[in-house]
């Protein structure tokens, strides 16, 4: 097999939304029929092209991460979730650096700092190292607090995490410029 991911993310398109594809039923049936390989996780969300923009689709998929992974053991950990909006990997890296300087333990998701911002080595790597681990995604439900970075992309995920696991949150602007960075 060429591809062997641990997580398969499925989303709709304008056409599949128009004809009424029911992702919940389709994926449940595939699971019941044994079509999803053992140990693989399939997450999904609706991303209709005619509702909102690419930001809406991104927000829906980030919210799906919470829906399918976050769990609470009722044991709060001294960790802050950093839920990223539409940001460059270099911006994410800087936010992680600042949190580390302040000695704040974080779980950043999605975290594209190492998987999308990699050097050109001349070797093809289908699955670059990095990103948020499944274990960390599950642990977001036990975090002390969440900070959503970018209202349009993260507010729904923050709300979902609070509803599901009672993790309080604040949603802030993307820290571009002095005013937003100081906030």
Question: In which residue ranges do the predicted regions lie?
Answer:
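An N-terminal assembly and electron-transfer interface module characteristic of large anaerobic redox
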Residues: 1-183
């Amino acid at each position: 097999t060429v591809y062997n991911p641990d997580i398969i993310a499925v989303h709709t398109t304008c056409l599949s939304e128009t004809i009424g594809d029911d992702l919940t039923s389709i994926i449940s049936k595939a699971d019941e029929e044994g079509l999803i390989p053992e140990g693989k996780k399939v997450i999904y969300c609706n991303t209709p092209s005619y509702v909102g923009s690419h930001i809406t689709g991104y927000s829906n998929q980030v919210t799906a991460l919470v829906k399918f992974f976050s769990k609470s053991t009722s044991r709060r950990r001294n960790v802050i979730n950093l839920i990223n909006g539409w940001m460059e990997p270099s911006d994410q890296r800087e936010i992680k650096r600042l949190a580390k300087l302040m000695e704040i333990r974080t779980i950043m998701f999605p975290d594209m700092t190492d998987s999308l911002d990699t050097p050109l080595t001349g070797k093809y790597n289908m699955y670059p190292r990095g990103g948020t681990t499944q274990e960390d995604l599950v642990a977001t439900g036990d975090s002390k607090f969440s900070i959503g970075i970018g209202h349009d992309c993260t507010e729904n995920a923050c709300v979902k995490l609070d509803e599901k696991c009672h993790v309080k949150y604040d949603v802030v602007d993307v820290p571009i410029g002095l005013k937003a960075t100081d906030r």
